[in-house]
């Protein structure tokens, strides 16, 4: 009985781990190719940054109920993405000097790492990621069926 209990716990943890690795890779690879399509090139660090952003956006439902208006999830998601982008930019562009991107020529930028135009550009992507993540979790991992409230 004792061994069976730990076996079940390990299997639950492995399912959780595999699910999150799959979702992380989907978002990281997708963002990497979006950037290649948009800029013509990318950097491997963007795969990690995109994976982290997608993972965090997908887990917003763990902190907010389904009754939370969708626009609030998008607003919080945008702030989260900006924070992750800033930290990633600080590490790869300022500390490591890899010069992956530079927004210093764009208006309303913060140390050339984040800027208002891209904060606005992220909104449709955040919208898509939240919905995609919810449905992937529903279809592939048998989690709760998504339902949204636009306004409350």
Language-model features: where?
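Aromatic-rich, lipid-facing transmembrane alpha helices and their immediate juxtamembrane interface loops
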Residues: 2-152
């Amino acid at each position: 009985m004792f061994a069976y209990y730990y076996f079940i716990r390990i299997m639950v943890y492995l399912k959780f781990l595999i699910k999150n690795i799959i979702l992380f890779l989907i978002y990281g690879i997708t963002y990497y190719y979006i950037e290649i399509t948009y800029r013509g090139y990318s950097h491997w660090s963007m795969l990690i940054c995109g994976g982290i952003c997608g993972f965090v956006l997908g887990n917003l439902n763990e902190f907010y109920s389904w009754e939370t208006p969708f626009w609030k999830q998008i607003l919080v998601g945008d702030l989260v993405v900006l924070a992750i982008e800033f930290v990633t930019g600080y590490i790869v562009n300022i500390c490591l000097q890899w010069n992956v991107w530079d927004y210093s020529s764009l208006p309303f930028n913060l140390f050339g790492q984040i800027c208002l135009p891209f904060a606005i550009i992220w909104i449709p992507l955040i919208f898509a990621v939240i919905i995609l993540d919810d449905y992937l979790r529903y279809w592939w991992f048998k989690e709760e069926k998504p339902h949204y409230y636009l306004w409350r």
